[in-house]
Amino acid sequence: MTVLHSVDFFPSGNASVAIEPRLPQADFPEHHHDFHEIVIVEHGTGIHVFNGQPYTITGGTVCFVRDHDRHLYEHTDNLCLTNVLYRSPDRFQFLAGLNQLLPQELDGQYPSHWRVNHSVLQQVRQLVAQMEQQEGENDLPSTASREILFMQLLLLLRKSSLQENLENSASRLNLLLAWLEDHFADEVNWDAVADQFSLSLRTLHRQLKQQTGLTPQRYLNRLRLMKARHLLRHSEASVTDIAYRCGFSDSNHFSTLFRREFNWSPRDIRQGRDGFLQ
């Protein structure tokens, strides 16, 4: 597995923060780093396989990656990221207690993926741009300024994450997308789902299309197919069983949709013919 080292990304040995844009981020094999990072998805879509679990990411997704986490990107489509790198929560010169603002693992569950709405994403971009402008400065005031901006970024993300902000339809849509990640195999009634998240069906269709480029059902089908592809690669379950586990009631229909989406059959993926296992 590829290991990325801080010496290749941080501007100096004492820099606590670095900005690494990926515009766009292509498919990238599994790796980990000797530093931490906050991945901010600007726009586009892709699959983020994080510690073996696939997540669909779109504009507004924020992922917190620790130095022992492993992850990869695949099936990217105009995926643009900004990575905010930091050495460790306790490696800042002027800040202490940052760990309290970061996601916490509880009973083996780590809430790595958050979502923010478009207006918050704009504020995030401004903070990141200010940090990036100061990267070449190594004096104490500049270091303190960058660390203060990093603290502001964490506060903004925490206050604006789905757990704490459901005031507008964009935030409720983000919560719906997070819900689909956990309920993709369920039979989905879009009228009922829209009601559940206090959205009109028209608003749901319009905003989901704006954010992902897909209609709700197309987005759900792609999510199911992504989950199925992951299981084909990493489990011994039969194609039929995987189809049912991912929300498809007809394995033949599943195979047709799968080939249309990936240009490979489920059997091809299982046997590694797409090159993933080579």
Curated annotation (Swiss-Prot):
Keywords: Activator, Cytoplasm, DNA-binding, Repeat, Rhamnose metabolism, Transcription, Transcription regulation
HTH araC/xylS-type domain span: 174-272
Molecular-function GO term, any one: sequence-specific DNA binding
UniProt keyword annotation of ATP-binding present: no
Outcome recorded upon mutating residue 249 to G: 93% of wild-type activity
DNA-binding residues (ranges): 191-212, 239-262
Variant or mutagenesis effect after changing residue 205 to A: 28% of wild-type activity
Locations listed in the record: Cytoplasm
Consequence of substituting residue 202 to A: 4% of wild-type activity
Source organism superkingdom: Bacteria
Site note Interaction with sigma-70, residues: 241, 250
Stated induction or repression of this protein's expression: Induced by RhaR in response to L-rhamnose. Binding of the cAMP receptor protein (CRP) is required for full expression.
Subunit structure: Binds DNA as a dimer.
Function in brief: Activates expression of the rhaBAD and rhaT operons.
Protein name (database record): HTH-type transcriptional activator RhaS
